[in-house]
Amino acid sequence: MTDRLVPASLALRDDGTLVSPEFGDLHLGASGALAHRVFVAGNGLPTRWQDRRTFTIVATGFGAGGSFLAAWAAWRDDPARCERLHFVAVEPHPFSRDDLRRAATHIVADTTISADVEALADAWPMLVPGLHRLEFDEGRVVLTLAFGESIDMLGKIVARADAFCLDGLASSSDADLQSTDVVRALSKIAGEHATFAVHASSDALKHALGKSGFTYREVDDLLVGEYAPRWRARRHEPPLALPVATRRAIVIGAGLAGCAVVERLAARGWEVTLIERHDRIASDASGNPAGVFHPLMTRDDNVASRLTRGGFLHAIARWRALENAGHAFARSTNGMIHLAESADDFERMRDAFDAFGPPSDYVSLLDIEAARAHLNLSVAQGGLLFPHGGAVWPAGLCAAQYAAAGERVRLLASTRVAKLERRGDAWHALDDAGGTLAEAPVVVLANAGDAARLAGLQHVALQPVRGQLTLLPPGSTAPLPCPTIGDGYAVPLDDGTLLIGATFEPDDVDPAMRAAGHLENLERVRHLLPGLIGDLPDPDTLRGRVAFRWVVGDRLPLLGPLADEAGAIANARALSGAQARDLPRLPGLYGAFGFGSRGLVWAALGAELIASQLEGEPWPLERELADAVDPARFLIRALRARRVGRAG
């Protein structure tokens, strides 16, 4: 169960200074000049990041963002700066957007910090637990905020830190942040000779640092040092970039998953060959007229809830970035309602809502009367209103991502990959005659059900599910103000057509349209929204579309590096208690498939995860969630159960 997020508030003292009443002055963080002296100069910056591809700073607090703004300004002012600056900050009590703007403006006033406070405030995420990734300066400065309790979140971050900003660790009033557990967590993500700096210090902090492998020294009123343990190497080292001679990749599959990967790799300077078996991108399920887009909510905030929340929020941020860069696409912006299927279902929704305590910009609970008023239609139950949920035209999104990649992507359409073969340091995508279609050190399989065949995976549980949707002509239904889901869905399209659906037919691979499928969709939506459809139309006269979704047994996607199954099976005894990090991997082979009906929610986050893994950057997912979507998870279960050698 995820703890509720308790935001900090901001108040004005009689003397005109700002303070957080609950957490005091220290929650604001260092002011601009102090932040620069402590966290920038104290970590040997800008010299240490110069001429590097990436540099990662991890902060034990964020407050009003003084340390981040100081680092951003120093990076901007340095002509020899690293190509990409990552700043990861844990914050148990974030400010609201308005309070953040006021506090940040307050602490940077009359300093030389030139970073744009408004840009930070404009990008500020919804106040819900988890990781939030924000990009600035065309994606070259990346802020990852970890909202949640410090010890908990530090243990979930996957990164290789080059420098630490120990915000809050010097305060004797903050026993939590002074604990050995926090500093030990920092030691697990510290890169070789990672430095730290803190203004003032306590004996407890010095003891914790020394015990966890950090050396330190006092310089004036600063405590500075580096990670230099005397003991042997750690069992699990922080992630490094994949060593490749050239930054080239092949992406197989040009749907939501593949186009998202293409855009994220191209944004980092990779040259990508995109291979699609159809004559255009977004031709299979990604070619549907629209798809609904929303997170899940459960009382226990389980893995699926946290993963869909992270994917939902990350996708919103990425889509806005695409639109701001001139790559707009069709999507609804007036929210989405998830209606309960029964009274018991509504009580489950209420329990989840009350347990999570979300802000209204994330979700609101609607009783029957409120849902009826919002939709102007009769409803059987209340539900949840997601103001930023809605419907997206998947093909338009794919086209926008493809356009954003620009000249860094080359499309091979109407091309089938018969086989993948590793030759030396490169993968070769081969046609039916054995000829090379493309070669690169990295391949990302984003081709749904065909991915397991190409990778030769035996321990991946994929199942095809037939989905038929129905299109009702303009004027044939009552007006619907926003997409609505429950047992089925109804989506108003721009031309007045109403999209309803969809059937869910496991292991059915018949591509033909069926009148029975239309009738099933009509009956389901009549139950969902009794006043939406009058007399049932003749199903034989209706238009629609059939597409196939590929789902995984646990209903989670497959994202990340693919396992070397043969190598793992050969070493099965030693790996019977393995974690995901212990398994051998096929060099440079990654997967982004098994999205089921949640491609819109998971594709952007999955692409960012894979790009971050390739580049050795901080991951946009917590370790537990990354393990939950690891393509090797079924192999791990088979190894633990000693069932290797047959599909698991």
From Swiss-Prot:
It comes from the Bacteria. GO terms for biological process: methylation; tRNA wobble base modification. GO terms for cellular component: cytoplasm. SUPFAM superfamilies: FAD-linked reductases, C-terminal domain, FAD/NAD(P)-binding domain. It is found in: Cytoplasm. Keywords: Cytoplasm, FAD, Flavoprotein, Methyltransferase, Multifunctional enzyme, Oxidoreductase, S-adenosyl-L-methionine, Transferase, tRNA processing. Catalyzes the last two steps in the biosynthesis of 5-methylaminomethyl-2-thiouridine (mnm(5)s(2)U) at the wobble position (U34) in tRNA. Catalyzes the FAD-dependent demodification of cmnm(5)s(2)U34 to nm(5)s(2)U34, followed by the transfer of a methyl group from S-adenosyl-L-methionine to nm(5)s(2)U34, to form mnm(5)s(2)U34. PANTHER family: SARCOSINE DEHYDROGENASE-RELATED, TRNA 5-METHYLAMINOMETHYL-2-THIOURIDINE BIOSYNTHESIS BIFUNCTIONAL PROTEIN MNMC. In the N-terminal section; belongs to the methyltransferase superfamily. tRNA (mnm(5)s(2)U34)-methyltransferase family. This is tRNA 5-methylaminomethyl-2-thiouridine biosynthesis bifunctional protein MnmC. It comes from Burkholderia lata (strain ATCC 17760 / DSM 23089 / LMG 22485 / NCIMB 9086 / R18194 / 383).
